[in-house]
Curated annotation (Swiss-Prot):
GO biological process: 'de novo' IMP biosynthetic process; adenine biosynthetic process
Name of this chain's protein: Phosphoribosylformylglycinamidine cyclo-ligase
Molecular function as annotated in GO: ATP binding; phosphoribosylamine-glycine ligase activity; phosphoribosylformylglycinamidine cyclo-ligase activity
Top-level division of the source organism's lineage: Bacteria
Record lineage: Bacteria, Bacillati, Bacillota, Clostridia, Eubacteriales
Primary localization: cytoplasm
Subcellular location: Cytoplasm
NCBIfam families tied to this protein: purM (TIGR00878)
Listed CDD domains: PurM
The organism of origin for this protein: Clostridium botulinum (strain Okra / Type B1)
The reaction(s) this protein catalyses: 2-formamido-N(1)-(5-O-phospho-beta-D-ribosyl)acetamidine + ATP = 5-amino-1-(5-phospho-beta-D-ribosyl)imidazole + ADP + phosphate + H(+)
Keyword Disulfide bond recorded: no
Functional pathway: Purine metabolism; IMP biosynthesis via de novo pathway; 5-amino-1-(5-phospho-D-ribosyl)imidazole from N(2)-formyl-N(1)-(5-phospho-D-ribosyl)glycinamide: step 2/2
One GO CC term, this protein: cytosol
InterPro entries: PurM-like_C_dom, PurM-like_C_sf, PurM-like_N, PurM-like_N_sf, PurM_cligase
Length: 331
């Protein structure tokens, strides 16, 4: 007789990982959570809204995971997973409510799975949403031993008449960029081609550790700004860089004019460029130091930047909007 364990699936290790995961998930629970982990589904009670709209998003971490495997550092990529999802739904003015994760592997190691979920828990705490469920799939022969994949799904909420969809953007509005923490979770297939030695020194740290800096979560500062200002459009700068993401906030035909010298370029991007990437390709791949963009009235720009600084963020007036063709113009 052949057992499930002999086929490559260790049920006992699965039980152990669930126990380790529960303690991390419980730290994220908010008032709307109605049940604990372990049921067939997570339940969440909607807060009191007049005309609520649920806003959802899903994403993964991509090949940044390979850096984590090679550095044997697993507790940060979970933050990336949450960030990629909640920053997306934030673009429409949605407050994150809850999150679910999916972890797949060839051979389950409970301690590694727990570290991954520790990162997810940390990301949920940063974005004030609850981790109410998830799935860990052990698939021997499908993934190589030691390899994991992680993806997530976020649900947020917004009042229907407060949804930000770019319809109020006007010619002459300005663009405020909020600093990123590094490449975030995009461009890593290219990075892995260029950076072979992850233990090489970069500004007093191993470059592998620098590249594992978690994606910045913008929920708290942006939600505070939404309470005070008329923010007309927002963009999460992910894969495709400036060119792909900034025009996504436009409902009409506008062009975003971005001044490359309006903010300091982080050294990690200068270093990557020095390894052989053309500048235009950099802006079409990476966030180039700006992880989130706000479109606002010019009169509000100075105060928004001041408020961002007071909240510990770095904000810059990086450009403006003009009539065009849903494009980006770098100057």
């Amino acid at each position: 007789m052949v057992s499930y364990k002999e086929a490559g699936v260790n049920i006992e290790e699965g039980y152990k990982s669930v126990d380790l995961i529960k303690k991390h998930a419980s730290k994220t629970f908010t008032k709307g959570v109605l049940n604990n982990l372990g049921s067939f589904a997570g339940m969440f009670e909607l807060p009191k809204y007049k005309n609520p709209v649920l806003v959802s998003g899903t994403d993964g971490v991509g090949t940044k995971l390979d850096i984590a495997f090679r550095m044997k550092k697993y507790n940060t990529v979970g933050i990336d997973c949450v960030a990629m999802c909640v920053n997306d739904i934030l673009c429409h003015g949605a407050k994150p409510l809850f999150f679910l994760d999916y972890i797949a592997c060839g051979k389950l190691e409970s301690e590694i799975a727990a570290q991954l979920v520790e990162g997810v828990s940390n990301g949920c705490i940063q974005s004030e949403c609850a981790l109410i469920g998830g799935e860990t799939a052990e698939m021997p022969g499908f993934y190589r031993d030691g390899e994991y994949d992680i993806a997530g799904f976020a649900v947020g909420i917004a009042e229907k008449d407060e949804i930000i969809d770019g319809s109020k953007i006007e010619d002459g509005d300005i663009l405020i960029g909020i600093a990123s923490s590094g490449p975030h979770s995009n461009g890593y297939s290219l990075i892995r081609k260029l950076v072979e030695d992850l233990h090489k020194d970069f500004e007093g740290n191993k470059i592998g550790n620098t590249l594992l800096t978690p994606t910045k979560i913008y929920v708290k500062p942006v939600m505070k700004l939404l309470e005070k200002y008329n923010i007309k459009g927002m963009a999460h700068v992910t894969g495709g860089g400036f060119y792909e993401n900034i025009p996504r906030m436009f409902k009409e035909d506008f062009t975003a004019v971005i001044n490359k010298k309006s903010y300091p370029l982080p050294n990690i991007f200068s270093h990557l460029m020095s390894l052989g990437i053309e500048e235009d390709h950099m802006y079409n791949t990476f966030n180039m130091g700006i992880g989130f963009v706000l479109c606002v009235n010019e009169k509000d720009g100075e105060n928004i930047i001041k408020d961002l600084i007071e909240m510990g963020e770095k904000g810059y007036k990086i450009g403006y909007v003009k009539k065009g063709d849903k494009s980006v113009e770098l100057i």
